[in-house]
Amino acid sequence: VTRSYIFPADRIDDSADGLPPANYPYDWGAGKSNYGMDAGITSNPKYREKLLEALWAIPSYSIAIEPENLFSDETGIYAHAGWHGRKAERNCSLELLPTIDEQEHGFQINAGVRIRGGFSRQPKFPKHGFRFFFRRRYGAKRLKYDLFGGNAAKEFSHIDLRCSQNYAWHHGFNPKALYMRDQFNRDLQFAMGHPSPRGNFRHLYINGHYWGIFNTCERPKAFFGKSYIGGKKENFDVVKIMGGYSEGSRRTYQVFPTDGNMDLWARLDELSQRDLSDLNAYCQMIGVKPDGSRDPKSKRLLDPVNLIDYMLVIFYGGNLDAPISWFGNNRGGNNWYGLMNRTQNKGF
């Protein structure tokens, strides 16, 4: 159990000379390190007070973890961001720090942490996202906390701390960096009446050292479906694109199931390859007869309204790395999920 006390006025000048703080390495694995904020900004009276205000403006997470579990050549998951699965999970303490305005009351929970992401796992990126798993072996089986407010889920088997990659300071200081695009798109989809991962933005400290802004986000797997669509976890099929960087192996971009199986998705994919100007083919996808009445012999495999609204969000948000990826020469998809409860007649 940990209880952290962070004083932003002391943290703003961390590693002003670019050198690592105590117990941190100069580099990790094949990756490159980047510590602290730019001293040219933090020491500038024009920006310093604004930075201090920003560190108080939103709540903060704190991770307490053995440094070697992140940075050592033998066991460090940050040094080997391309590691996947349980072998790449390390125990830690995760805190959401209480705020003086009581916007957050905070929590502490022991968890397993992994690196998350695809392309962003490459060693050339100095900033990686995190995924936290709540298991009996660490303590509580679930995180029970009102992370997102409103009628959002209050119980979680895992959560993500995402960081932008394609358009971000740590990827060529890209001038297109917005940081909010993905969550804005998810919020739009939710506003259009569809289940969508809730999220917010929080600061992160690792062992007391400032690590940047991260996007807390739900992961749309079976537990998400149970929370927002209803039903049992084991009744959900969830599919996504697998790809990105993996240390020691090649990961091609292809669809695979994170929960359940691929049977219904494969059937939907097969139907989508047909001539959909043929009314019968389209009707098979949405489980109706040509007259629009329910077909008891056919299962609804697609929610067309959800798909249409999703594509509107993609176009409006200018997302170039989702159902069709510009980074893949517009020849394939990336960064999407499909979710369906097999016992309900709603489709993916």
What does each model-found stretch correspond to?
Residues V1-N91, L96-G112:
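Short, compositionally stereotyped local motifs that mark structural "simplifiers"
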Residues Q189, M311-G328, G332-M340, G347-F348:
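Extended, hydrophobic alpha-helical segments in both membrane/secreted and soluble proteins
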